[in-house]
Amino acid sequence: MNDDIKTVTVYPTTLELTTPTKSANGSNDDYDPHQHRELKNPTTNFQTFAHFLKASVGTGVLAMPSAFAHAGYVNGTLLTLIIGSLALYCLHILIKCMYILCKRQRVPYVSFSQAMNLGLKQGPPWLRCLAPIAVPFVDGFLAFYHFGICCVYVVFIAESIKQLVDEYLVVWDVRIHMCIIIVPLLLIYSIKNLKLLAPFSSAANLLLLVGFGIILYYIFEELPPLSERDPFVAAGKLPTFFGTVLFALEAVGVILAIEENMATPKSFVGPCGILNSGMSIVLGLYVLLGFFGYWKYGNESEGSITLNIPQSEIPAQVVKVFFAITTWISYALQGYVTAHILWDKYLAKRFKETRQTFYELIFRAIIVLLTFGCAVAIPDLSVFLSLVGSFCLSILGLIFPVLLQICVQYTEGYGPFRIKLIINLLLLCFGIFGGVVGTYVSILDIIAVYK
């Protein structure tokens, strides 16, 4: 560590980062960061698992049949599993590198942005110049990405309510429905810790289960011959598929936040841990809904499969209510990351401790109003889903974790024939290529919508 670095603020606590001290045998092996975490409201394994499922199964899963229409059912199945496996691998290496850096610094926890800062300082010399901008850069991307998700959620909830109100009461503009949901959003977003949010996530998962059951009922009703669907499609459509799937699968900020808040973080990354078990369920669900949804509706698959099922039937309307409720809960979970970063790391220290609770609630209310404002200004915000997935998540979920591992392994070596470096460089190229191409195609799609 450079001598000019004295302290680093790690939310929710402040940790002193000094030159790592070593044990008598000259190593840091005796220090286990997990045993030194002190949390005010730690979550149990079950609560963490509920949060993981809710964070990973959002509105993006409803777009999977449409994503498969841009890939074909064979390509879609294989590529979803490949992208999901790569995303899972990158989450593993990210959490592992953060743990290694904690051991080296002998601190209980470092955030994603601090890990990038420390890793770049210990990595190849030509990368060390990037260390000073790592913290604001990573924090900015995470806060912006999860803020963007919340904007999309406002649109989704309002549109779901509008469809029901239009059917039974009166036809209003979607912006009026956005105004109506401000108060419920303010209420759920005022819950400031994950332990209190856990019962909401558990309830949301039950509603999701019932909702998916109803959707699958409609899907399996009079399935057409599979021969009417394309196993493969033109390669030009794949970038849109890539962005949609990555957006649906990755919630890196929430995943890191729930791991940080665990009472037993060792249970998160084990072979049968929460990360592997949860991602297996999520991947299975995404492939199931994507494959059979595309089989049923083909190229007519809408951006949300709830628009394909009969709109006037009671079960279909129940699905919309359930997904509106679960998305309302997801708003608090995804928005937690934005508030967690901006308030705890940058704003809280500007106020007296006795007034921080009040001002944090004000700050959270401002975030809700900003997401509302963005949704009102651009009600077609859902068209940006693939763009956000391709750009932000290729950086946060693929490129940064791989770059961090390259830096962390620099002093220890990359193994025989530098095999670890080669693997990481291949993943880096995949992330850059997917991000650039996906972003380009998504921008073209947005231009086409607004022509």
Swiss-Prot record:
BP terms from Gene Ontology: amino acid transmembrane transport; regulation of growth
Phenotype seen when the gene is deleted: Viable. Adult flies show delayed recovery of the midgut epithelial wall following the cytoplasmic purge response to intestinal bacterial infection. RNAi-mediated ubiquitous knockdown or tissue specific knockdown in enterocytes or epithelial progenitor cells impairs recovery of intestinal wall thickness after the cytoplasmic purge response to intestinal bacterial infection. RNAi-mediated tissue specific knockdown in Malpighian tubules, visceral muscles, enteroendocrine cells or the fat body has no effect on recovery from intestinal bacterial infection.
InterPro entries noted in UniProt: AA_transpt_TM (IPR013057)
Residues with attached carbohydrate: N75, N299
Protein's membrane topology: Multi-pass membrane protein
Localization per record: Cell membrane; Late endosome membrane; Lysosome membrane; Basal cell membrane
Keywords, alphabetical: Amino-acid transport, Cell membrane, Endosome, Glycoprotein, Growth regulation, Lysosome, Membrane, Transmembrane, Transmembrane helix, Transport
Extracellular face of the membrane: 70-80, 158-167, 221-237, 294-320, 379-382, 442-451
Expression induction: In the midgut by intestinal bacterial infection; probably in response to the cytoplasmic purge response to infection by enterocytes.
A cellular component annotation (GO) from this entry: lysosomal membrane
Residue ranges that the UniProt entry lists as topological domain Cytoplasmic: 1-48, 102-136, 189-199, 259-272, 342-357, 404-420
Entry comment describing in which tissues the protein is expressed: Expressed in the proximal and distal regions of the midgut; expressed in enterocytes and progenitor cells. Expression increases in response to intestinal bacterial infection and spreads further into the midgut, eventually covering the entire midgut.
UniProt-recorded Gene Ontology molecular function terms: amino acid transmembrane transporter activity; L-amino acid transmembrane transporter activity
Principal localisation: membrane
Residues that span the membrane, as ranges: 49-69, 81-101, 137-157, 168-188, 200-220, 238-258, 273-293, 321-341, 358-378, 383-403, 421-441
PANTHER family linked to this entry: AMINO ACID TRANSPORTER (PTHR22950), AMINO ACID TRANSPORTER TRANSMEMBRANE DOMAIN-CONTAINING PROTEIN-RELATED (PTHR22950:SF340)
Family, similarity comment: Belongs to the amino acid/polyamine transporter 2 family.
Additional detail: 'Arcus' Is the Roman goddess, homologous to the Greek Iris, who personifies the rainbow and replenishes rain clouds.
Purpose of the protein: Amino acid transporter which has pH-dependent electrogenic transport activity for alanine, glycine and proline. Plays a role in positive regulation of growth by directly or indirectly modulating the effects of the TOR signaling pathway. Required in enterocytes for the efficient recovery of gut epithelium following the cytoplasmic purge response to bacterial infection. Acts cell-autonomously to promote the retrograde transport of amino acids into the intestinal epithelium.
Protein name per the record: Proton-coupled amino acid transporter-like protein acs
